[in-house]
């Protein structure tokens, strides 16, 4: 993730605010024979509440392939308040030929966002994921 890098958290916040933000999920695949989509395209979530989203993934190729998901949130100023408790994007994923899987991401929006003049009025955010072949991903890191 670029400027909109999200945070990794070990625990949920202690408070849930009676304010909602609409979170849109954008899914992409690069250099893999995979279909990848969110089961829910948009979620209206309360700030501070833990949410769970499922993604459907399918390998339509004829061999086992490995993917790594990169992620980014926009607007980028929101990234520090988008906290993941668990995500398929933390690890390399493998899918056999024809295999379908459900990947899960658990997240919350940090209540501190309402104290930041750059984020307190944000009502819509987009979480984007792109799966790359792990071979491609490793080469790009050299």
Segments (PLM) and residue ranges:
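Intrinsically disordered, low-complexity Pro/Gly/Ser/Thr-rich segments with frequent PxxP/GP/PP motifs
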Residues: 43-44, 49, 60, 86-113
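Terminal connector regions
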Residues: 64-74, 78-81, 85-86, 111-142
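Membrane engagement elements in two modes
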Residues: 1-35, 142
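Short, well-ordered turn and helix-capping elements at secondary-structure junctions
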Residues: 29, 38-40, 113
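Generic structural hydrophobic/aromatic packing signal, biased to beta-strands
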Residues: 21-25, 69, 90, 129
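A general secondary-structure signal for short beta-strands and their flanking turns/coil
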Residues: 18-20, 50, 64-66, 100-102, ...
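Buried hydrophobic-core signal for structured, non-transmembrane domains
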Residues: 54-57, 105, 127-129
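Mid-length scaffold segments of soluble, non-membrane domains
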Residues: 33-84
């Amino acid at each position: 993730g670029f400027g909109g890098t999200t945070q990794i958290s070990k625990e949920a916040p202690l408070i849930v605010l009676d304010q909602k933000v609409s979170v849109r999920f954008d899914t992409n695949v690069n250099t893999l024979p995979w279909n990848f989509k969110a089961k829910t395209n948009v979620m209206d979530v309360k700030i501070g509440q833990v949410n769970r989203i499922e993604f459907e993934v399918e390998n339509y190729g004829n061999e086992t392939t490995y993917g790594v998901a990169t992620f980014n949130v926009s607007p980028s100023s929101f990234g520090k308040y988008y906290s993941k408790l668990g995500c398929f994007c933390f690890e390399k994923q493998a899918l056999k030929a024809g295999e379908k899987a459900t990947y899960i991401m658990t997240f919350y929006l940090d209540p501190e966002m309402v104290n930041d003049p750059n984020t307190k009025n944000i009502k819509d955010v987009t979480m984007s994921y792109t799966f790359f072949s792990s071979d491609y991903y490793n080469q790009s890191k050299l």
